[in-house]
Design a protein with these regions (language model features):
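Compact, glycine/acidic-enriched structural inserts
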Residues: 62-103
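Hydrophobic alpha-helical interaction segments
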Residues: 95-116, 122
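A surface-exposed partner-binding patch
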Residues: 1-69, 114-172
Length: 172
């Protein structure tokens, strides 16, 4: 995976239509809910949604969603290659952070609607993305993300003092 991260950091490519904006790790904006030890490498470019690895979780990719009502941090891929394959299958990041929140049938309906509105710009950007990084689309995105949800103990994620202050809760 280090080679894929190296290529990604070298290319610094943005795929705005796919909802993938390159973020320089040492300059990326972090939010109250960004985990301690997070290395932000990309964002959706809206809503504060960003993607990171967390030092204590190895190569696992997390989505951080500051305006979510059902938690703020979701593991979504085992590594960068899987993250990219999910983006390819879903034709963007727009539904990726929603998978943990939706029952499968609702997710599949949302995906069907999303794919039905694919325009030439999105198709061209997706082709460029898959070619640039040698991406093969994931065949079971819902199961991939949900299986990871069951593997990762998110209670082990460490948050900053600001996180607890914003939420008005005491740190254990």
């Amino acid at each position: 995976m280090k080679n894929l991260f190296k290529k990604y950091n070298k290319e610094k490519a943005n795929f705005f239509v796919l909802g993938l904006r390159y973020e320089k790790p040492n300059k990326a904006e972090k939010y109250f809910c960004t985990p301690v030890g997070a290395k932000v490498f990309a964002s959706m470019g809206m809503g504060g949604v960003h993607y990171c690895t967390v030092e204590s979780f190895g190569e696992t990719i997390f989505a951080v969603v500051p305006d979510s009502a059902d938690g703020y941090v979701f593991p979504i891929a085992h590594d960068l290659a899987e993250f990219f394959s999910l983006i390819a299958e879903l034709e963007g990041t727009q539904l990726l952070d929603q998978i943990p929140l939706f029952p499968k049938n609702i997710f599949e309906n949302a995906l069907k609607d999303h794919l039905a509105y694919a325009d030439e710009e999105r198709k061209a950007e997706l082709a460029k993305f898959t070619k640039m990084f040698g991406v093969v689309a994931a065949k079971t995105p819902y199961e991939t993300v949900m299986d990871l949800q069951n593997e990762i103990d998110i209670s082990k994620i460490e948050f900053s003092k600001e996180y607890y202050d914003v939420l008005g809760i005491e740190k254990d």
